[in-house]
Each structure stands twice: as C-alpha cells, then as structure tokens.
Amino acid sequence: ESSLPKKVLIAKPFYYSYPPMIKYSGMETVYLKTEEGQIDLDDLRKKIIDCRAIIINSPSNPTGRVESINTLKEIESLANQYGVFVISDEVYKDLIYIQKNYSIAGPHVITINSFSKTYGMCGLRVGYLWSLDNTLIKDIIQMKTHTSMNTNILGQAMAMKATKTPRSFIREQLKVWQDRRNLLYNGLKKIDPDLWNPEGAFYMLPKIEKSAEFVWDMYRKYDVISYMGAWFGAPGRVRFSYALDKKKIEEGLFRINEYLNSRHL
C-alpha cells in the first residue's frame, strides 16, 4: 500500500471520464495547468510530489495536442524519483503527425492502448495494457474479471487479425487524417483565430460564444453532433471530431457557418 496521498494528477482539458473514474476509485483529482493545451512543467514539478498517480493522454482527447518528448521524459524521471504511478493513455499514439512516438517507460508506468482508434474498431471496445509490475497486473486482471468480465469474441478475433496489419498501412492512414484535419482546421480557424492545430488524434477544441447553446442548437436544428468543452474542463469551447470523410466535414462546416450567421440576423 502506497504512503502517498490518494490524489491523481490530470491536465486540463482532460478526457471527460477521468474525474469520475478517479472519484469512484476513492481518489481526489488534482488539475495541472496547461499552456495552449500542453502541460506546464513548472506546475507539474510542484504538484507531482503530493500525488499517487498521474494520467497522461498524448495525443489528447479533446485537444489533439501532443506532449513534447522532453516533457514526457521529464514526467518519466519525476515519476521514478518520487515513486508516482504514471497511467499513460496512448490510444491515439499511432495517430501522431508531427514527431516520432515516445512511450513513457519505467517500473511505475502502466501503458494503456486500444485497437479502437488505429484500426477503426471503436464499437468493439478491445483494449490492452502493460506494466513491469506483475502484482499490479494480477490485481487488474481480477478487477476486469469481476466487472466487465469477458471481451466479446468478435472483437478478440478482429484484434488478432489487426496485429498482422503491416505498419505501412497505419503510416498511409496518417495522410488521410492530416487531410481531414487541415480541412476542419481551416474552417474552424475562421471562428477561432487562436485555435490549436492538432498534432495527433482527431479532435479540435475551438472557442465558441454561448458554447452550450451552440452544441444543443447544432444537434437539434442542424443534425451536427459536437460536445461541450465544459465536459472536458474547458468551458467556452466545443469539441469536434474529424473522424468523418471529407464530404461530411465540408457539409458540417457549411451547417456551422449557416447557424452562426443566423445568430447575427
């Protein structure tokens, strides 16, 4: 049993399930400052010494930002120094456009990954993790066994097939994702000139006035689905996904502009 406080560090904006999962684990969430969606290292150094674990999500859902390799190495070093667990959520790691992948490693690191994003298997919910801590892995297997039980057979079969997919296929898909990103980014930048350009994953998080009203109006009146940034710890922003073909992205941008223009009539 760790003697460290029952606190878990996450960066804002965050994936919206992190705070509830931390709460249901009997822990307290501590929030890290970010600069343009990337971790503030000075704030990290101050707060990590008072936490039991830190969750890293790079590339990020909801921002698409990627932490620099230097930042990831600093987290790796600090975690090792203070005995803090690192939960590295790397489900978008194959969807990085701007640098080589770097995976945090060490005795206190738990790496989480998924077949959902890389192979387009989102609905099948097949994931995996690894760690050097065998005791921890055994505890996780017990928890999995007595909560969600077995992973569906179809998903397992597809996952095994996916492991035989050439890496060249994954690299080729990056061009498709970049084209979609560029299309959405150029459209949304007209709404938010300071919009962060995603370096990975497939999300954007622009500032939009009356964001809650925007999300519900777009859904009810224009059949466009987006998520409120407030759900991710980013009030005043809206999360969009570009996991769509380019024609749908173009149509979505047209409807967004149509709605925003109607606001000013």
Language-model regions, residue ranges each:
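Substrate-binding/gating loop at the entrance of the active-site cleft, primarily
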Residues: E1, I10-M27
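Phosphate-binding glycine-rich loop
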Residues: E1-K7, S211
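A short helix->loop->beta-strand "cap" motif at the edges of active sites that frequently abuts
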Residues: K6, M27, Q81-F85, P107
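Helix C-cap/helix->beta junction micro-motif
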Residues: S25, Q81-Y82, I191, Y222, ...
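Active-site phosphate-binding strand-loop segment of PLP-dependent enzymes
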Residues: E36-Y97
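PLP-dependent enzyme catalytic core of the Aspartate aminotransferase-like
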Residues: D42-R45, K210, D217-S226, F232-L265
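Conserved core segment of the aminotransferase class I/II
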Residues: I110-Q178, N182-Y185, F254, Y259-L260
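Conserved glycine-rich beta-strand-loop-beta hairpin in the small C-terminal domain of fold type I
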Residues: M160, V176-Y185, L195-I208, G236
